Amino acid sequence: MRIPSTSWRRIAAAASLATVTFLTSACGTGTGSNGDAAGSAAKSGDKPFIALSNGFIGNGWRQTMVAAFEDAAKQAQADGLIGKYKAINAPGDNSATEQIAQIKSLLLQKPDALLIDPSSPTALKPVIQQACNAGIKVVVFDSAIDAPCAHVIQNSFTDWATHAAKPLLEGIGGKGNVIVSRGVVGSQPEAEMHKTTQKILSDYPSVKTAATVTGMCDGATAQKAVLGVLSSVPKVDGVIGCGDGYGVAQAFTSAGKDVPAVTFETNGRALNYWKDKKIDNGSVAVMSDPGQSVAAMWAALDLLDGKKVPEHMTLPIVLVEQKDRDAWASVLKPDQYAAWPWTRDLFRQQVEAAENGGKPVQPPVPTAAD
């Protein structure tokens, strides 16, 4: 299923504008970006207040995720579905302590629903329970969580790690040297992905892991990390990452080496680089969906409306294969990550599929620009 490219351009443009707003809160001002401008409280009546707590803002995926939420929340506010909204980004490097303090501050503002992209699968349990005890609907996304009172929306990180590794390993003929670039170490998704990657590598005895670095699922970070080990690894056939391939490619180029098979990020810059360089060596682009924040908002609104929502939902990852690469590349800004365009109707289709034991509904891929 496809939708017109003009819709994707509007999504990308709105997200780019929102980035300017929420990066201020990421610096630790504590104010966040919000929809409660002067006078809106008087107009909101009993419409719900939706708050988002984000535990880490240090990569483009997280920035796209917050921007997607803000764009959708702004439209929901204009449509009279919510009274106000707020997105707050915890400062620091994925610190559970800082996010807990952030959430406690949000609870004092009495939101009706709290969306959380957590920094830890366990440390936030007490503060989440505190929110539930206060009657707040809690939807955690982008990670599993040890908090029975919360609803959870996430992608399959096993699928992500599998699609990031297997095509690449097959592309290099199942043998050679690889570098593994890990993501946000300490988070539940990264732990699950690394475990999957190691399991897959064990099925390829002729592949040697020459080095392991921490790229944080961020191109710039991965570029520095990979460049730091290239001098000690004479030959590299592939780099298994979590959406940091553009930076990895730059590391090889700056070192005067051929670009091996990599796991590209799903943003416009990486996809156009992949396209323009005519790379066909097992590379793939795959990441979790930053649009999960929007799906979480629809889940929260359904819960507030008394509708049934599964306690745990697994939504499709964003896999960009070569056949869809050009369509995505044509509608994304350089720093904009591919995100599924969740509408309330599409979310309800996912709920129905989950309740009936069916496969997740595949969201639409954009049509290529004219």
Feature map (PLM): residue ranges:
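A residue-level marker of the well-folded mature domains of exported/periplasmic proteins
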Residues: 2-10, 27-370
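Sec-dependent N-terminal signal peptides
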Residues: 8-19
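C-terminal motif of bacterial Sec signal peptides marking the signal peptidase cleavage site
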Residues: 22-26
